[in-house]
Each structure stands twice: as C-alpha cells, then as structure tokens.
Amino acid sequence: MSAPNPKAFPLADAALTQQILDVVQQAANLRQLKKGANEATKTLNRGISEFIIMAADCEPIEILLHLPLLCEDKNVPYVFVPSRVALGRACGVSRPVIAASITTNDASAIKTQIYAVKDKIETLLI
C-alpha cells in the first residue's frame, strides 16, 4: 500500500483504527451507519451524525475533502483510517467504502463504545 495522503489528517493509528472499525461493524448491524460520502454529507446536514470516518487511500482524495470542512462547521469529530477496503468490510459491504457516518441513537446498545471512540477522535483533533 502506498503512503497515506498528507491531506488525510487526522489519521488513526493501528489500535484506534481497529477500535473504529469494530464500532463501525456493530453500528452496521444495528442500522446506525450510513455508507458513502454523499450519505455522510446528508447526516451532517441533518445533524444526526456522531462522527465521520473517511478512507485515507481514497483516489483522488479531493472527493472527500468537503467533509472535514462540514464537520468543523457542525462540531462533529472526524477521522481518517488507512484503508477503504477495510472500511468497506467493516460496513458489511463487498465494495470499498471511502466515507461512513455513525448516526445518533440515544437508545443504542453500543452508545458507550461510540462515545469512547468519539473521545479518542476528539483528542486527535487537538
């Protein structure tokens, strides 16, 4: 795999990437996940996004770079993971996924895990 794009900031380390992908997989099973850059944009505009995950190996990366700007406007944490293929697998689809959004649900079974990951992502952004 080539080196991640320098525009992909903040990039999660291996341990955090694994934790993020685990939460993504559980959220996908609970229908609490939106896949793709367009759907992630919609969740941000509607204000129902907990955090945004993007793939750093997206080519060209510019097709994703409107998301960090929107996230900062809406005060939503965002993070890059190294692989779009791994993100696609975690989302439960057979295709690569370049962006995903964990959506808000107060009655969620994985609420504590979502908040734990969200806090770690927020510390990366500082």
Swiss-Prot record:
UniProt GO MF annotations: RNA binding; U3 snoRNA binding; U4 snRNA binding
Q: Which UniProt keywords apply?
A: mRNA processing, mRNA splicing, Nucleus, Ribonucleoprotein, Ribosome biogenesis, RNA-binding, rRNA processing, Spliceosome
An example of a Gene Ontology BP annotation on this entry?
Answer: snoRNA guided rRNA 2'-O-methylation
**Can you say where in the cell this protein is located?**
Nucleus, Nucleolus
**Looking at the Swiss-Prot or TrEMBL record, what is one Pfam family this protein matches?**
Ribosomal_L7Ae
Name the consequence of R84A. Impairs binding to U4 snRNA, but not U3 snoRNA, and causes pre rRNA processing defects and an accumulation of unspliced U3 snoRNA
Output a single Gene Ontology CC term carried by this record. small-subunit processome
Q: How does it assemble?
A: Binds to the C'/D and B/C motifs in U3 snoRNA. Component of the U4/U6-U5 tri-snRNP complex composed of the U4, U6 and U5 snRNAs and at least PRP3, PRP4, PRP6, PRP8, PRP18, PRP31, PRP38, SNU13, SNU23, SNU66, SNU114, SPP381, SMB1, SMD1, SMD2, SMD3, SMX2, SMX3, LSM2, LSM3, LSM4, LSM5, LSM6, LSM7, LSM8, BRR2 and DIB1. Binds to the 5'-stem-loop of U4 snRNA. Component of the ribosomal small subunit (SSU) processome composed of at least 40 protein subunits and snoRNA U3.
Role description: Common component of the spliceosome and rRNA processing machinery. In association with the spliceosomal U4/U6.U5 tri-snRNP particle, required for splicing of pre-mRNA. In association with box C/D snoRNPs, required for processing of pre-ribosomal RNA (rRNA) and site-specific 2'-O-methylation of substrate RNAs. Essential for the accumulation and stability of U4 snRNA, U6 snRNA, and box C/D snoRNAs.
Q: What is this protein called?
A: 13 kDa ribonucleoprotein-associated protein
> Which species is this record about?
Saccharomyces cerevisiae (strain ATCC 204508 / S288c)
